[in-house]
Amino acid sequence: MTIFNDKYMCMLELSGIYKSFFKQRILEDVSFTVASGEITGLLGPNGAGKTTIIRIINKIFTQDQGHVSFNGSLLTQKHIAQIGYLPEERGLYKSMTVEDQAVFLGRLRGMTKQDVKTALNYWLERFDIEDWRKKRIEELSKGMAQKVQFICTVLHDPELLILDEPFSGFDPINIELIRSELLKMKAAGKTIILSTHNMKSVEEICDRVVLIHKGRKVLEGNVKTLQNESKQGIYALTFKGNMIAFANALWVGYEIIDKEVHSDDLFTVYLKMRSENELNDLLNTVIPHVKIQKAAEVLPSMEEVFMQQINKEREEASHE
């Protein structure tokens, strides 16, 4: 069993996973770990192999090589009852009522009918949708059906929750609702994997990320650590004063790369350090000329971290 730190341990480990379909390599030597009690983002563009990885974890596909461990043991079919999986292709039986759908799926996960109804009561009340119980799925709006699908995924109280493109098609209200529930589940000790091509949608709630590109893992680590390792010396300064006076106060060690005009005398400017200067050097340069309201280093998004790594690999390959 892999120990991450004093608090968290490894729940899921993929080691040397290969998978091909019709002689086309889909996954190549994919290895990564998922820590217990954390939210891990499985990120990458469409077609990178993320869904294939998830289906291997759920025993829908079998890998050609490598192994998957769950809580220190080789993953077997018996572990699947401890996993909640929300696939990208949402699937509910439209003629069923919400309650019948929940009972059907809960029974597949080994729950008794009474346990399903008890859990369903809890989630319907939590989402303030108790009156949906006897509605048929076909009577629900898309957003309503999405809530039901999420409830059916977590009904059996899984140890590991895997959501494939979790916010795809959700309206902003439901996105915030699901995001809030995921954070509550994490606080309760659940382990969560969020798989998406939309890195911005999950980077704020992920503890760790695994970046997948063309069937290979290109990067893995703590979100803040990866962002700090990839930062480009860009700072955001919000100030009151004259924009021309601010620009004139700068010297060749700084480059203005963008700005936001909030009012006639309130601006946010994004600057890139051209040398080994630090934030204090920048502040000492401009404070005599404008009133600084906020100053902070800008960390790259996970999409920017991803592109930096891809460009680095391309450059290294071109020199081989």
Predicted feature residues:
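Catalytic Walker B motif of ABC-type/P-loop ATPase nucleotide-binding domains
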Residues: L161-E165
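Conserved ABC ATPase signature
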Residues: R136-G143
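Conserved ABC ATPase "signature" region
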Residues: V103, R107, Q114-W132
